[in-house]
Structure formats: C-alpha cells, structure tokens
Amino acid sequence: KLIDLYMHDWRSLFYIWFLVLSSIHAVVIMIFTQDLIRPGSSVLNIYLFLPVCILFAMPYIFYILRYTKTNHVIDIIYKNNLKYIQRLGSRKMRAFFEISDLKDSKVSAKRIDKITEEFQRYLMECLNQLDNLLDYTGFKEPRAEVIRKMSHSIQVYVKEKPHINPNFFKITQAVRSDISFRTMVEEKQLSELEQDRIFFEVKSFRLLGNAYVLFLDRNEFDLASLCTAELTAVGKTAAECNDNPLLKALIFQFNTMMRFAIKQATRFNEARNLYNLAFHYANFVNSLANHHQIDLVKECFHYFRMYGNEIFNHAKQNYSLYFIIAVLTAELKNILINIHKKSWDIEIQGELLDQILELDTPPDMDRDEMDDSQLTNDGVRDIQISLA
C-alpha cells in the first residue's frame, strides 16, 4: 500500500523525476563535454539543478517520513474509502446506473459489471489494508484508530446506501474472490448477501470479529472493548436507517463474540471482556428498543437469557461469573424500564420480564441442588426486578 500511496503523491513524483532528469542532463554534459556547443548547459546543471536538488533533499526526507507514518497512512486509506463510498451515492453514479437500465441505452452491461466490480474491489482492498495495519502496528493508538475508521466507514456507507443504485449490490468476482467470502461455497449464501445488500458490512464485521478474538488472546481489554463499542455505534446507525438485514447481521456478530468471551472467561477465569461485551451488547439492544424493533428486541432478550443460563452453569466452578449474571440482569432491567417509558404493549413487556426472571434459573436445575451463594445471588435479582 505504501508503494501505491507513493505513486499517487504528485510531490514525490515531481521531485524524483526532477532528480532523474537532472542526473541524465549531468551525464550527457560529462560525455559530450569536449564537443559541447552550449557551455551554458554546464552552468545550468551545476549552479541551478544541483543546488535545488541539495536544497530540497532534507525537506523531502522529512516529508516522506511523515507521509509514511502509520497514522497518516490510515488517514489516507480512510479518506479514499469515504471518497468512493460517497461517489456511489452521488447523483452522477445514480444517473449512470439508471441510464444503463434503459433498453436503448448505449451503456453496455459488461461495462456496468466492470465498473461495479472495480468499486467493490476497491472497497474490499481498503478494508483489507486497514486490517493488515492491525497486525503490522505494535502500538495501541494506531490500532484503535484503525478500528474507529473502519467503524465510521461502515456508518457512512449505511447512510449512503439508500441513495446507491440496487445494481451495485450484485455480487461480482471481486467479492467472491475476497478471503472473507471464499468459505461461502454455497451460492445461496452469496445470493442472500446480494438480496440483503450487506456484503460490505459483513466483510467489516468479520474483520472486527477476527480482531476481537486476537485482542482476547493477547489480553488487550481496551482494544477488545473498543471493537464492541464501535459495533454498537454501527448498530445505532443501522437502527436509525431501519436496515433490518444489517441489524440481524449485527445480532449474529454480537452472539459470535459472546461465545468467544464466555469461552475466555471460563478457561482463564477472566470476566472483564465478558462484562464489557455484555454492556455494549445491551446498549445495542437499547437502541433497538428506541426504534421500536420489537421482534429483534425479543430475540436479543432470548439470547441474553440463554447466555445467562450458560454462565450460571459455568459459575459452579467459577463464582466470579455470578457477577456477570447480575450485570446482564441490570442491563436488561434498564432496557425494560426504557420500553415501559415508551408505552409498549403490556403483553410484550410481560414476555420480556419473564425472560429476565428466567435469566439464572435453567429449566433442568432444581433449586434444592443450588448452594447458598447461588440462592443469595438469585434473591438480589428478585429485588432488582421488584424495584424496577
């Protein structure tokens, strides 16, 4: 990517070509110095070209050092990505696709497919380059910047998507050949992506999910939490735009992360990542409630109850996990209070309340088999529900 950036920087190209041409000019003077008819050429090279090259040598070195800084490279990739996304939603591109839909249009279908593939390939490449920088960079701040830029790119894309012509979402070879989609061997999976128009978001979620697992393995809690926080920000934007397929993809991604977080918490007795994820997942569900996504809220409450039951079983060997159940209960309680303020149907509120009450009571477990710590923990949540 550095080579690509360098080849598109006009200042670097101008200076390098000036050096090359000046050097060629000097060599020509040296070879033909005896037969040189115009001695002014030697004066021009020695007293003008050479001083200019020397004068700008050090500033150019510092310019290149600054230009190749990780933060600057991230910013360039991000801005170029935004530029392409905004071009997709521009009037010119919409008019181009609309003209191509006409039967008597001079724009051929092959040309449309080629342009679509080029745009899709560039968007995929930008995401892959940002993902590579996560591995390349050893400092936390640049990696955090990559995660934020990736999240903001998705949010801008989601806002622009209603203005993008549907023909753009056709799955081309650029998407099929991308590493994130090569595991989709069934045509049905790709056709669903095309129908839901979420190939770009799914690609981003997979990269963020991989980064999240990597941060879990490295015990980098702050960066892992940032991944989930940025997913929540994307979810709020998707809820505002009423993008249901994207919201379902987000729920799937959060559930995948929950699996990894629970696995890490039970294996290494480390519940911090699980706590952070539960907090951000609950914020996402709250944003769904704010936009009256009843079915999705019900689905998320079901998942929370399922995870609570699973954590409750793991807590027999690790008592610190009881705190996570209390966190899940408290977060769902806050969501239920918000739902009550928005005057949802009383039956729906009752269903959600039942999910909370079953959060730490698996159907296959008898209360007589529970120890005192489990019963005490259960009583605390009963008090929380009563206060709610």
Language-model segments: residues:
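Residues that scaffold, gate, or flank divalent-cation-dependent active/transport sites
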Residues: 1
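Transmembrane helix-loop junctions at the membrane interface of multipass transporters and ion channels
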Residues: 4-7, 16-51, 55-71
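Soluble C-terminal extramembrane regulatory/interaction domains of multi-pass membrane proteins
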Residues: 66-388
